[in-house]
Design a protein with these regions (language model features):
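RNA-contacting regions in translation and RNA-metabolism proteins
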Residues: 1-42, 54-78
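Glycine-centered tight-turn and secondary-structure capping sites
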Residues: 46-50
């Protein structure tokens, strides 16, 4: 559910919604949601001073219902 919600939010922000990928993996410290977008959309997802990324993390944390979830925006150029 978190993965689908994050995918929907990010697709609404970017210019290339077909290039958005969200993957989930479990770690001992909780779940990690990795967001991959087209390189031209990376700045749009991160936002000025990281505000958009912080807002996405806040929404996901609220939906997580107490579970430990981390959202990482991955730079696919590296």
């Amino acid at each position: 559910m978190l993965e689908a919600a994050l995918l929907h939010l990010v697709k609404g922000i970017v210019d290339e919604p077909d290039q958005v990928r969200v993957s989930s993996r479990s770690t001992p410290r909780g779940e990690v949601l990795e967001v991959r977008v087209h390189p031209a959309d990376l700045g749009r997802v991160i936002g000025r001073s990281g505000r958009t990324a912080k807002a996405l993390r806040t929404v996901v944390a609220a939906l997580a219902d107490g579970r430990q979830v981390r959202v990482d925006v991955v730079d696919v150029d590296r």
